[in-house]
């Protein structure tokens, strides 16, 4: 069976561990050269905790550290480092006494020429996610950065990805579900949507919903599997069912192969068709 292209599973602890590991690598690299280094591209995003594995093109090595220089004459061949020229000025800041980095907005723009649209959306969704420990920027800040720097390699792909980005998502897995839904011609999914529960006279927030079709998609990550969260999810979904909504949880297995995703969306599509035809769901 064909494996799905994106390995995007992470926990907050894993994100912190990757950021710390990358920081140590950057410090070691900086101490071995007299050249001033400004870390950028995917390295900058990893320093901020992005563990999503993107589909990079062959001319980008994700196993190397990436740095940016402001002049082509400063390009060099450092060991285990890929050096890039960026002709739009370097939006540089220091994250400690030794390590200089570009802004997250610049790093996002820089990777656009090296990834596909889906990967770019995942990176943008991550950078603007709802988690206060991981959120790095907003769509408004990214748009303002675009206005300031003008054209750059990959800008068309970047603009398309930005139009598909949804701020305040909860995980890259939700991004994948949303993108796969678009590919299949299904309606627009609303992210983090409030749903009114008449029996409880309150609202609950769901990951994603086809608003007019009463079909909900939710990703059940590892943190859903402690007993309290598991019981809370069951209660929430029972209440949503009573309110006339049908919920389709996705798990790690859903993303394991393209065949699994195809089957998942066949079921989702059938539920949408059923609601449109009858105004309800069969049990």
Spans of features found by a protein language model:
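Short gly/ser-rich loop at a beta-strand->alpha-helix junction or flexible surface loop bordering the NTP-binding
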Residues: 1-150, 280-283
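Surface segments flanking catalytic/ligand-binding clefts of nucleic-acid enzymes
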Residues: 1, 131-283
């Amino acid at each position: 069976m064909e494996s799905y292209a994106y390995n995007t599973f992470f926990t907050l602890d894993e994100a912190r561990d990757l950021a710390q590991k990358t920081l140590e690598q950057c410090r070691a690299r900086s101490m071995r050269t007299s050249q001033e280094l400004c870390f950028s591209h995917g390295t900058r995003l990893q320093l901020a905790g992005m563990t999503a594995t993107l589909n990079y093109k062959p001319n980008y090595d994700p196993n190397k550290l990436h740095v940016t220089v402001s002049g082509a004459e400063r390009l060099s061949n450092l060991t285990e480092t890929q050096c890039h020229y960026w002709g739009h000025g370097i939006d540089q800041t220091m994250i400690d006494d030794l390590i200089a980095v570009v802004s997250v907005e610049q790093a996002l723009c820089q990777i656009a020429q090296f990834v596909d649209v889906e990967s770019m959306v995942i990176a943008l969704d991550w950078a603007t996610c709802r988690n206060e420990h991981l959120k790095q920027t907003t769509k408004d800040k990214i748009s303002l950065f675009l206005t300031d720097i003008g054209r750059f390699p990959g800008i068309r792909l970047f603009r398309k990805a930005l139009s598909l980005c949804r701020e305040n998502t909860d995980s890259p897995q939700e991004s994948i579900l949303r993108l796969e839904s678009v590919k299949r011609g299904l309606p627009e999914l609303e992210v983090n949507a409030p749903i009114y529960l008449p029996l409880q006279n309150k609202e609950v927030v769901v990951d994603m919903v086809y608003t007019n079709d009463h079909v909900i998609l939710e990703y059940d990550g590892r943190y859903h599997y402690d007993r309290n969260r598991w019981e809370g999810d069951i209660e929430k979904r029972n209440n949503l069912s009573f309110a006339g909504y049908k919920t389709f949880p996705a798990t790690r297995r859903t993303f394991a192969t393209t065949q699994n995703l195809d089957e998942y969306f066949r079921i989702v599509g059938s539920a949408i068709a059923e609601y449109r035809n009858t105004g309800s769901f069969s049990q």
